[in-house]
Each structure stands twice: as structure tokens, then as C-alpha cells.
Design a protein with these regions (language model features):
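Alpha/beta-hydrolase fold catalytic core
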Residues: 76-136
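Binuclear metal-dependent phosphoesterase catalytic core
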Residues: 136-172
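Active-site neighborhood of divalent metal-dependent phosphoester bond hydrolases
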Residues: 1-87
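Hydrophobic transmembrane signal anchors and adjacent membrane-proximal interface regions, especially
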Residues: 9, 85, 98, 166-169
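Active-site neighborhood of phospho(di)ester-bond hydrolases with catalytic His/Asp-centered motifs
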Residues: 51-53, 126-132, 150-153
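Flexible, charged surface loops at secondary-structure boundaries
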Residues: 45, 118-124, 142-144
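Short beta-strand-initiation
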Residues: 37-39, 127, 146
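Active-site environment of divalent metal-dependent phosphoester hydrolases
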Residues: 1-3, 57-59, 117-119, 128-140, ...
Length: 172
């Protein structure tokens, strides 16, 4: 979508109405709230899985760091500075890859393109994400220690994780 008259990025399902609502909730209201700032996470771990908006890949991880270090140490700082217009946006979350109309080598955690940039990896581990529309929940590296699921089915499906095992269900 257009963020400036001369800049266009592609993000499935984005409409002017959704952008307006997002802006109002997350910027005009939500991000001014200390609780929201202190508790919102760009990536979250639970039951052996990583949850993020668009997914994580090896190329996003700074050299010499582990995924755990990025989630626990780097992302909280990046998030706290996300709205600071004097702070250069960190490509870990804000990079827009060529597949989405950007100029970065790979998209960040908010912009990674599933079809052209994502690959499951034992270095990252199990994960759940969306951002790139798929008609049905789609698994990569199923039944491995780096099983990854894209659940962006336009609100048609959800998943439950029990004992580390992910199962998808249709929303009725």
C-alpha cells in the first residue's frame, strides 16, 4: 500500500479503512498507553513455538546472535523506539524486501514475504505467522523441530497448540 505518493509496498488484504483503523488504535490511542508499550511483543514464544506477524528467517538474525537473544534482548529495544521518528527504523522489523516492493534483501518481522523470502530453519525453530495470504493453513517442514505454519487465511482458520503440537481448525 502507498505510504508516500512515490512509495508503494504490497500487503495482502490492506485497505484504506484498515489502515485508518490501525492508525487510530495503535498510534493515536494504543501506543500512547504505557501498558501497551510494555506488553506488546514483536515476537513471542510459548510451548516451544515462536509467534510473529510475518515470520523469522536466518537472514534477519544479526551475526553472532541467537534467536533467543534477538527475541529477549533486541526486539524489546527496537519496539520501544518504533514510534520515535528521530530513531532510524531497525530493519529487523521494518525492512521491506524486493518481493513486497521494497529495496531490502529480506523483509523484517512485519514485512517478510512467505512465498519469496521464507524458509523454515532449525536455527529458528518452530513458528506460527501470517502476513502473506494462503488459501488454507500451510505447513513447512511438518513434523520437524522447525515446523512452521502460515495461518493468514483471511480469518477463516485458527490453531490450537497442545503439548507442542499444532492443530488447525476452521472458523464456523
Amino acid at each position: 500500500r502507498s505510504v508516500h505518493p512515490s512509495i508503494t509496498y504490497w500487503c495482502s488484504g490492506v485497505t484504506k479503512s484498515k489502515i485508518s483503523t490501525f492508525r487510530q488504535v495503535f498510534y493515536d490511542k494504543g501506543l500512547k498507553d504505557d501498558w501497551f508499550l510494555n506488553n506488546f511483543k514483536i515476537a513471542h514464544r510459548s510451548q516451544g513455538w515462536i509467534f510473529s506477524h510475518a515470520g523469522m528467517v536466518n537472514r534477519q538474525i544479526p551475526y553472532g546472535m541467537t534467536v533467543d537473544q534477538v527475541i529477549d534482548e533486541v526486539l524489546p529495544d527496537v519496539w520501544l523506539n518504533f514510534r520515535n521518528i528521530t530513531y532510524r527504523q531497525n530493519p529487523l522489523i521494518s525492512a521491506v524486501g524486493i518481493a513486497r516492493g521494497g529495496e531490502d534483501n529480506v523483509g523484517g518481522l512485519l514485512w517478510l514475504d512467505y512465498y519469496n523470502e521464507f524458509n523454515a530453519s532449525p536455527d529458528i525453530g518452530k513458528q506460527v505467522f501470517g502476513h502473506s495470504y494462503v488459501p488454507e493453513p500451510t505447513a513447512t517442514a511438518l513434523n520437524t523441530e522447525y515446523e512452521s505454519w502460515n495461518l493468514d487465511t483471511n480469518l477463516k482458520d485458527y490453531a490450537i497448540i497442545r503439548d507442542g503440537r499444532l492443530t488447525t481448525y476452521k472458523i464456523r
